[in-house]
Amino acid sequence: IRLSLVGSEMCIRDRYEGSLWSRGILPQDTSKMLRDERGGHVEVDESSSLDWDTLRARIKQHGMRNSNCVAIAPTATISNIIGVSACIEPTFQNLYVKSNLSGEFTVVNDYLVRDLKKLGLWDEVMVADLKYFDGSLSRIDRVPSELRELYATAFEVEPSWLVECASRRQKWIDQAQSLNIYMSGASGKKLDDTYKLAWLRGLKLSLIHISEPTRLRRI
């Protein structure tokens, strides 16, 4: 809406005419276009709860200032610097040492620390356990099961759920999203299943590298 207002107050972007925006096609409409192009084989929930027709009409009348509005880029290093989670990424580990060109620094899940302190469980033994188990709570029995589930690390989250979440986001994104898929004990079948699921959900995947969880130290 804001970019449509800017387009009406200033001017629309170059080469607006002929774009998807000028034809009243919003990001969530493109899954149907992909289905028509494929002749089916796109399993995406296309339901919505807001009045998008009004926005379509406004954009067709006033245009858009930008060619794209939303893109989700990799944010791992930035999030570490400012002390927040990495946007759409699952937590890599609850405690680990990160290495990059600037050196090495320790990353701790502050939200986990807060919850463990409330339960009186944050102590030197807990820190030692997290180091020993590579930042995972799964084998620390004194941590309540609900916390172990809540703070599951990236390699403990089933990859299919990451794909499902990406699919639900993508229909509202007009550019693209960057998402890492983590696999513990990756196999040819696991990779094939993940690629096929992503394809059915209207996503694209690119394989950059595969690393085992215990060996993944450089990020």
Descriptions of predicted regions:
Residues 1-7, 209-219:
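Single conserved hydrophobic/aromatic residue that forms the stacking wall/gate
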